Amino acid sequence: MNKIYNNLNIENLIKTNWFDKFTLAQQKEIRLGLEADLDVSIYAKTEFVAWQMEQIRLGLKNNIDVLIYADNKYSWQQMKVIRKGLEKNFDINILLKESFSFEQLLIIEDGFEKNINILNVINNKLTREQIKAILNCYLLGLKVEIKDFI
């Protein structure tokens, strides 16, 4: 965001040409960030879709280091799982290096919501079913390794 807009209040900012270049959904995320007094300059960029903006905004709201995932190379689904992992203080480095499918990400996210991080025992070559089986083993208190499922 250009410095010229720094001293404008929200009502005046949304009347600028700068704000008009965003879609309505993107504008909503920017407005929500401004209303929460967040640094929207991190995500108020046209290259982010609204869902990516939302994940960055939620991370800022929860005091997460969003610069880890505020990159257009990550889909909004990847950003969501990375954010949730960071919120739990899990090691999410594999998520930054490997590209998991949407279905795989849903299982990883399910584990995060149950305070279980299986990232150290999976990779993106495993099927959805294999990753789900590993998560289920962890839920039962069983420790497993990838070799147990290949």
What are these language model-derived features?
Residues M1-I150:
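General marker for long, soluble alpha-helical cores
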